């Protein structure tokens, strides 16, 4: 078993009690493979959830496609020596750690489909393509539980901190990416009223006005010499100048103490936040919401957001996984919602011009069916590119039980294929997802997600994309073509890295509260 303490059922005991913890195996792996995986974890490290995945990364500069980097066993690891949680990917054939991501408090774990999960990593957007949906669901539940507990603990500490200073032009954050300016209109929210922190201003040019700054006040003139007469001086029409500094304002629903009012958000703002993968917790966090507010104001305010959203077509919500057979023999039990072998399209999220545009399907030999209209997308479902297809073809019977595994359940049939190209008028289609590399010779039996497990056992080396990595060094990020959604995602990823680094210091102060959680 693990090189740490022997696995015993239950959760960690109280302060001073014996460590009672066990490693959770995967049903897709054989006993000796689970055993080997536990040995790779390290001293006093426990896996709370284990399954088989493909690791996809949306690499810079454009982050327009998913690139499959590794294939292996993923573990949600409780690392007691470091007093932190990690998502770690191990290669069973290589016998080593392939990739890891530490869990930070502001991490937003999204599930566009039951088998494809995504979140912002330290360097780029990360996607996990699971071989088994039930194990994927258990993995997601554990990750979100730990994120929620950490956020609750830190929100209690932040209530005692003073509110952040008001956003002033001289105090703008200098790390925002350059985005082409969006012209603002003069129609929007209520006009007039006091100019508060929650208002976006648009200048109305008027060359005929005088130098007076405020409507209804006299133009500045020489001071009176007679104090007695100046106290009761009447103001005539000649003393009143034309209005100046008149501005049209639109409300974005933000204040420096409570963040954005999530219950009264403008629909276009809500759509922008949904596409960029921003959660309600981030919108109500004082520091994070100030960063988002500054970004919106720098890009042209609410009118720029409205113009950006008007250029985007409404996107359909994700359909249920299609289980119906198609073409070459069907994937197994359960009738699919598509019927007749025509798969439904998964969600298309993100801006067509942004960091994560929709991807056309991998060439399968036939034209895909038209998308099924479903209405507008649900909130909170935006940001990363759509899920990639499984490793190999989608036809054929389910994979047989693995030899010597003692009869573990076989993985479920594959989910529906990726979406077709976007409709005309919604912008140029982004480059397609490159075909998933497979081994030479005849395809592995079982197809679909069973082949993903075979890749791990056989140790297939997946093709990398060195060109994309070289371009990320040679070229600056292509912010010009990303639009507001992609630029906002880029800003939030920077914010995640800052919070991640600052959490290391905060965790030191909260060690006394977490002593019961970690094993010595």
From Swiss-Prot:
Biased composition (Polar residues): 203-213, 471-482
Modification after translation, per record: Phosphorylated at Tyr-293 by FYN and HCK, inducing WAS effector activity after TCR engagement. Phosphorylation at Tyr-293 enhances WAS activity in promoting actin polymerization and filopodia formation.
Biased composition regions of type Pro residues, renumbered to the chain: 358-437
SUPFAM superfamilies referenced in this protein's UniProt entry, alphabetically: PH domain-like, Wiscott-Aldrich syndrome protein, WASP, C-terminal domain
Molecular functions per Gene Ontology: actin binding; identical protein binding; phospholipase binding; protein kinase binding; SH3 domain binding; small GTPase binding
Any one Gene Ontology BP term: actin filament-based movement
Listed CDD domains: CRIB (cd00132), EVH1_WASP-like (cd01205)
Stretches assigned to the WH2 domain: 448-465
UniProt-annotated location(s): Cytoplasm, Cytoskeleton; Nucleus
Positions of post-translational Phosphotyrosine modification: 293
Domain WH1: 41-150
Each GRSGPLPPXP motif repeat, start to end: 354-363, 393-402
Residues recorded as bearing Phosphoserine in the entry: 501-502
Record remark on domains: The WH1 (Wasp homology 1) domain may bind a Pro-rich ligand.
Subunit structure as annotated in this protein's UniProt entry: Binds the Arp2/3 complex. Interacts with CDC42, RAC, NCK, HCK, FYN, SRC kinase FGR, BTK, ABL1, PSTPIP1, WIP, and to the p85 subunit of PLC-gamma. Interacts (via C-terminus) with ALDOA. Interacts with NCK1 (via SH3 domains). Interacts with FCHSD2.
Protein name from the UniProt record: Actin nucleation-promoting factor WAS
Organism: Mus musculus
The organism's taxonomic lineage, starting at the top: Eukaryota, Metazoa, Chordata, Craniata, Vertebrata
């Amino acid at each position: 078993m693990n090189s740490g303490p022997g696995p015993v059922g239950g959760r960690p005991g109280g302060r001073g009690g014996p460590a009672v913890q066990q490693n959770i195996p995967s049903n897709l792996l054989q006993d000796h493979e689970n055993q080997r995986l536990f040995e790779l974890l390290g001293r006093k490290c426990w896996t709370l959830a284990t399954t088989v995945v493909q690791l996809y990364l949306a690499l810079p500069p454009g982050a327009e496609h998913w690139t499959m980097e590794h294939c292996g066993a993923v573990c949600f690891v409780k690392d007691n020596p470091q007093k932190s949680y990690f998502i770690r990917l191990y290669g069973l054939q290589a016998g080593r750690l392939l990739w890891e991501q530490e869990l930070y408090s502001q991490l937003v774990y999204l599930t566009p489909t039951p088998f494809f999960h995504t979140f912002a990593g330290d360097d780029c957007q990360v996607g996990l393509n699971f071989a088994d949906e039930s194990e994927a669901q258990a993995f997601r539940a554990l990750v979100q539980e730990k994120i929620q507990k950490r956020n609750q603990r830190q929100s209690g500490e932040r209530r005692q901190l003073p509110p952040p200073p008001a956003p002033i032009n001289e105090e703008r954050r200098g790390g925002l990416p350059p985005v082409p300016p969006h012209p603002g209109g003069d129609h929007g929210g209520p006009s007039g009223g006091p100019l508060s922190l929650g208002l976006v201003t648009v200048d109305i040019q008027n060359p005929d006005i005088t130098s007076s700054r405020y409507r209804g006040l006299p133009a500045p003139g020489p001071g009176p010499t007679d104090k007695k007469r100046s106290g009761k001086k009447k103001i005539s029409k000649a003393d009143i100048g034309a209005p100046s500094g008149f501005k049209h304002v639109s409300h974005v629903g933000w204040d420096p103490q409570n963040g954005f009012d999530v219950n009264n958000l403008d629909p276009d703002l809500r759509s922008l936040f949904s596409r960029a993968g921003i959660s309600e917790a981030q919108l109500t966090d004082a520091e994070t919401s100030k960063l988002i507010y500054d970004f919106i104001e720098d890009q042209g305010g609410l009118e720029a957001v409205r113009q950006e959203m008007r250029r985007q077509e409404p996107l359909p919500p994700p359909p249920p996984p299609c289980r119906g057979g198609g073409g070459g023999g069907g994937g197994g039990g359960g009738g699919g919602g598509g019927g007749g072998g025509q798969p439904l399209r998964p969600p298309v999220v993100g801006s067509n011009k942004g960091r994560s545009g929709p991807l056309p399907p991998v060439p399968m030999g036939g034209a895909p069916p038209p998308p099924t209209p479903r209405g507008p997308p649900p909130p909170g479902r935006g940001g990363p590119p759509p899920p990639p297809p499984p490793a190999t073809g989608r036809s054929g019977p389910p994979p047989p039980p693995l030899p010597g595994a003692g009869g573990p359940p076989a993985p479920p049939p594959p989910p529906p294929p990726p979406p077709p190209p976007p409709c005309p008028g919604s912008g140029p289609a982004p480059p397609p997802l490159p075909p998933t590399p497979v081994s030479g010779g005849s395809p592995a039996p079982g197809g679909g997600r069973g082949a993903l497990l075979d890749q791990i056992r056989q140790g297939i080396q997946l093709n990398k994309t060195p060109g994309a990595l070289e371009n990320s060094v040679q070229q600056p990020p292509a912010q010009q073509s990303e639009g507001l959604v992609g630029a906002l995602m880029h800003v939030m990823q920077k914010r995640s890295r800052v919070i991640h680094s600052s959490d290391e210091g905060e965790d030191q102060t909260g060690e006394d509260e977490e002593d019961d959680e970690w094993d010595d």
